[in-house]
Amino acid sequence: MARAHPTTRVKVRRGTLISVDGIEAAEIVAAARARLAEVPRQRRAGVSLWDASGVFDDLVVAGRDAGAPSARTLLLLYAADLAFRLRWEIRPALAEGRVVAAAPYVATALAFGRAAGLPAGWLKQLFRFAPRPAQACYVDGSSARSGFIRFACGQLSLANGFLAQDVVARARKHLKPSARSRR
Amino acid sequence: MPPRLDNRRLRELARARFTNPGGRRGFLVAFEGADGSGKTTQRKLFKTWLKAEGFDVVTTKWNSSDLVKPIIKSRKAVQALGPEEFSLLHAADFRHRVEHVIMPALWDGKVVIADRFLFTGLARDVARGLDLDWVLQLYQPLLWPDLVFYFAVSADTSGRRVTATRTPNFYEAGRDVTDLDDPVESYHRFVTRVIREYESLAVIFNFITIDAEQSMSQQHYQLRELFREGGKRPWSEWNVDAVVEWLALTRQRA
């Protein structure tokens, strides 16, 4: 009998959380959908996306007069959005025994936080409420046109004189170890 | 952009600013207590008195940043917040005010009066069932007030004063965690928990407790006296991390 080739198929269990993290939103969403496509249709719950709560959309409305948010403030808001996603999208799907993909999840936020110079210990504590994924994937994309990190750099650069590309490059370096450590 | 300063140099700058014996340093006073404890009335009287005494005073209120307040308000209106989101959004609002209101005023040598400080977040969030240690982490790096006035009232007094003129709203009454439909009954149950948390925090963080069942004038004159005594306190070294982080941000923004 031929030896089975190492498979990339998702091992289906009751209630499975897959995290997909990366810099570019379009790429991580595509990767998350590809993962879910390997799961039987009746077990698929869908992809939980960044800003499902609309917090960051509302932040843009506040405008520049409200003052540029710091990296710490942005991460507290990211965590609030993630708490919303967990409550309304991820945990209900897991409770129904479905496979749900979170794209992005915690590793993206950790990478941005580290790139912005925040302490690793604080970041780890902040996201303590988020369950560990059964599978953690990282998309090593080349672009950074959209998504949380791109958005966050844009917000910071309003007033801070941050060089967005530096933060993106540093976040990319941090992303892989962060994603691995969450496995 | 100004030259990047290392952490050691920023610490030196912070200490020099807040321990300069020649000048009046920034001073942070927090007013804490359950709803209906009368702290807002006392805060206003206290501010008027401080200004008459020649102090430059800035007031900051809980959940008041231009950036985050609208986000919280819209979600409260549709009762969409779970305990974690509630806690995280208030911590974000607080952080933004620390960076844009509180620290700049302290750096300029002003007296900052905070009508509720991070202890409000701790008391309410723990009363909602969250872990104190996790909630405390959200407020890092911690900025400790020079004085915390805690206005102590019983749950009965708080309930009587709040419900005398209005019905407590959904979150104020803690209906998100009590599962009670009656706002007054829910308020009483929730504020009992909040007061219990405040009493613990008062011991842990060395609050100055004001008996808020006293007359208004008794409380006000007590505050004056306490400020005259406490106003000579040296700057707390515990605050150096918070000042350094803000200085680093400010220099990036300059």
How would you label these PLM feature ranges?
Chain A
Residues 1-12, 18, 27-39, 142-183:
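NTP-dependent small-molecule kinase module
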Residues 102-105, 123-124, 129-146:
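Conserved phosphate-donor/acceptor-positioning beta-strand/loop module used by diverse small-molecule
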Residues 17, 99, 136:
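Hydrophobic "anchor" residues on beta-strands that sit immediately upstream
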